[in-house]
Swiss-Prot record:
GO terms for cellular component: ATP-binding cassette (ABC) transporter complex, substrate-binding subunit-containing; maltose transport complex. It is a peripheral membrane protein. Part of the ABC transporter complex MalEFGK involved in maltose/maltodextrin import. Responsible for energy coupling to the transport system. It holds the Pfam family ABC_tran. Its EC number is 7.5.2.1. ATP binds at G36, P37, S38, G39, C40, G41, K42, S43. The complex is composed of two ATP-binding proteins (MalK), two transmembrane proteins (MalG and MalK) and a solute-binding protein (MalE). The keyword Translocase applies. This is Maltose/maltodextrin import ATP-binding protein MalK. It comes from the Bacteria. It is found in: Cell inner membrane. It catalyses: D-maltose(out) + ATP + H2O = D-maltose(in) + ADP + phosphate + H(+). SMART domains: AAA. It comes from Shigella flexneri.
């Protein structure tokens, strides 16, 4: 195991900056997930750690050693790519041992490591098969095994589940999580799927346009996003946003006016520092935190546009006339409502988020469980 530290790391191609002033501390044995939309620089960041991309400026440390100019083979890292990249003419055992043979490892060492890793990954009964005889999940396990036999200090995974169907992705997520718990290796995992990030990570790094938007534990990012980008990216369906105007402030409270015909006002338990009366801000509320109207004091009303019945839950898209946008309401039950009907939902102030015009969040003061 080894720690990974990035200090003011920047990557640029000419005048195009794809990673800017990245500062990260990844501890020994941590499972860290880089997540963000396409083009945010997450794979580039992983490739700089691996040594497949040069660092324009800043420093990279693996363990206590500066690695900027160290060749990839000498960094003690192993990498799994989105593509399995297996040799079709070689067996599972031969694919897994290929790197060790190139490195000149002794035959008994190779056999011992391959057999140990095959047991961990449940591949022992498949060692003599060729890749064409394997399922997609089995091929991905072989690709992971090929990296594991090299015994890297840091394990890098670049969107390893993207080529799998939904059921296999769930299965492989569970297997990767178990593998990390069993081996205790430092793992850095890249994905655009925030569900993978939330379920796998000890710590999530959210990237936006080449910068670190927020670093934290999954529930910290879910309940206390640092800005509107993180709030909208983490969570599915995404957070609802409403334009509001500040009408008053007090210690640890901000009063805002909702965009409804009755101009209803509500006090939100958020940090009021630097918030000015009259400022235009955004109120955020997650679909699952909206309430049935009969148990709430603050009511929003609109017309039902779409109803999605998922069996265990219902998602209702409601158009609020005064702002001409849809809110998503999610309830863990069957809700029978017709499209076109008028539907009222409740807004709990303690579950609301408030964002300034520049997108930064006013710190929520409501204590959430598990954080």
């Amino acid at each position: 195991m080894a720690s990974v530290q990035l200090q003011n790391v920047t990557k640029a191609w000419g005048e195009v900056v794809v990673s800017k002033d990245i500062n990260l501390d990844i501890h020994e044995g941590e499972f860290v997930v880089f997540v963000g939309p396409s083009g945010c620089g997450k794979s580039t960041l992983l490739r700089m750690i691996a040594g497949l991309e040069t660092i324009t400026s800043g420093d990279l440390f693996i363990g206590e050693k500066r690695m900027n100019d160290t060749p990839p083979a000498e960094r003690g890292v192993g990498m799994v790519f989105q593509s399995y990249a297996l040799y079709p003419h070689l067996s599972v055992a031969e694919n897994m041992s290929f790197g060790l043979k190139l490195a000149g490892a002794k035959k008994e060492v190779i056999n011992q490591r391959v057999n140990q890793v095959a047991e961990v990954l449940q591949l022992a009964h498949l060692l003599d098969r060729k890749p064409k005889a394997l399922s997609g999940g089995q091929r991905q396990r072989v690709a992971i095994g090929r990296t594991l036999v090299a015994e890297p200090s840091v394990f890098l995974l670049d969107e390893p589940l993207s080529n799998l169907d939904a059921a296999l992705r769930v299965q492989m997520r569970i297997e990767i999580s178990r593998l990390h718990k069993r081996l205790g290796r430092t793992m850095i995992y890249v994905t655009h799927d925030q569900v993978e990030a939330m379920t796998l990570a000890d710590k999530i790094v959210v990237l936006d346009a080449g910068r670190v938007a927020q670093v934290g534990k999954p529930l910290e990012l879910y309940h206390y996003p640092a800005d509107r980008f993180v709030a909208g990216f983490i969570g599915s369906p995404k957070m609802n946003f409403l334009p509001v105007k500040v009408t008053a402030t007090a210690i640890d409270q901000v009063q805002v006016e909702l965009p409804m015909p009755n101009r209803q006002q509500v006090w939100l338990p958020v940090e009021s520092r630097d918030v000015q009366v009259g400022a235009n801000m955004s109120l955020g509320i997650r679909p699952e935190h909206l309430l049935p109207s009969d148990i709430a004091d603050v009511i929003l009303e609109g017309e039902v546009q779409v109803v999605e019945q998922l069996g265990n839950e219902t998602q209702i898209y409601i158009q609020i006339p005064s702002i001409r946008q849809n809110l998503v309401y999610r309830q863990n039950d069957v809700v029978l409502v017709e499209e076109g009907a008028t539907f009222a939902i409740g807004l709990p102030p303690e579950r609301c988020h408030l964002f300034r015009e520049d997108g930064t969040a006013c710190r929520r003061l409501h204590k959430e469980p598990g954080v």
